[in-house]
Amino acid sequence: RSVSAFLLNRSSDLGGYGRIYVNALSDYDYDEVIDSLTRVFGIVGICPVVQIEDNGFDDLANQVINYLDKAYKNKNLTFKVNARRTRKNYPMNSMEINMELGGRILDAFPEMKVDVHKPEVLLQVEIRGDVINIYSIEVPGPGGMPIGTAGKAMLLLSGGIDSPVAGYMVAKRGVQIEATYFHAPPYTSERAKQKVIDLAKIVSKYSGPITLN
């Protein structure tokens, strides 16, 4: 899907950790979007969230129970609730939210058990202004720095493994790369040239478009 089908919003609350919210404006392929985001340098993790309006604690508890019911068919799991607030005038503090939601979850799903050390389900509840985000899955991102934040470099791309790996590692540090390949027929074949082109395409999945000179 085109990125124009999504709305991006930036946030820097909750302790200063930067967040970018991606809201779908049309139907999309979930796996395709997650796969694309896991190849974007600068992203540490991707969290698919259910975002609701703040309509009081009872509504929040019902939404959490509904979320768990849909997300986990097997309820014989251990869990922990981790609530965080940017709106400090919320009528309950984070610890109270954790305990109250935990109690509601145990009432709804008696087979679930609390484990605050190594839970199988870490339920995150983030109260941000007038909205609340609920999630329990975090897909690891590649980390690194966003492409273009550390200048440009030229990559000497050959048909071996070292040069594409070097290109990947440099791009992960925020460097925008172009590639150069020395094609010297008859000493290098068209097959060798095509291999370099294919390697450039693989690296470009992470680095963005690469001009191959």
Per-segment meaning from a language model:
Residues 1-9:
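Single conserved hydrophobic/aromatic residue that forms the stacking wall/gate
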